[in-house]
Amino acid sequence: MPNTTEAASSSWYLDPLVAAQKREVHLELMRGWSNPSPTARLLKTDLFEEANGNDHILFDIEPAPRRRFGIDLDISTVQCAARRFEQPGAGLFCCDAKHLAIATGSLDAIVSTSTLDHLASTDELRDALTELARVLRPGGKMVVTLDNPRNPLYWLLRLLSSWGCMPFRLGVTVSRSRLIRMLQQTGLEVLDSRMLIHNPRLVSTVLFLALRRLLGRRADRPIAFLLRAFAALDRLPTREFTGCFSAVRARKPVPAMGAR
């Protein structure tokens, strides 16, 4: 995990240790699931973390793809991410995930981390998944994560979002099983799925803020202990209800030889 004093200024929406946890969980997911080759062309579907936080992953995925692309609907977010990460072989641009300005079958890997759960309807979610499947090459892999609607605390978070109490508005989301079906309907083959990050949403945020206020830098140890305890919930049968995000890995089938 990075030094918390270095991370604090760039993770205004997450405790530094939580940002480091989220980053490592997603990087581990990419290492185990997407496995991009050094020649791969990889797309990440939003740049909020790259623009604002220490939970960024686009420029940390290994093995390093030859070309990294990132899109976001908000031009200021794209510009901020570009200022933070001046990377050769990277292309960051403003684009709608439902209407990608990307050629069909041109990407080797796609990472969509809690992007599509900001869309307004399941129809828009379906359109975005179809569009992502379109730009993926045959044999290419995609990882999609969404807010988990089976987590009871998600609905409190959604209520606060509707009241304007959050820096972003939550949109539609679906269960892991429905996400799997929607990906299959685009023609993709689903390979794996799991739940990610079991910190109790909002509750842990308030708790960590209180610990930081009381203990300052000395709060690192109790917060790290709590994060390990929450992570252990992934081993329980209740993980479908404690996970903050559903994650699904899918692959675009390679047409059989001679198929038209």
Tell me what each language-model feature is.
Residues D192, L196-R260:
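A C-terminal cap/extension of S-adenosyl-L-methionine-dependent methyltransferases
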Residues R41-H99:
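Class I SAM-dependent methyltransferase SAM/SAH-binding core
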Residues L119-E131:
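A short, conserved alpha-helix within the catalytic core of class I
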Residues Q21, S162-R178:
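Acceptor-substrate binding/catalytic loop of class I
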Residues M1-L43, K141-C165:
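Conserved class I S-adenosyl-L-methionine
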Residues V111:
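A conserved beta-strand element that flanks and buttresses the S-adenosyl-L-methionine
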Residues S114-H118:
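Short catalytic micro-motifs in class I SAM-dependent methyltransferases
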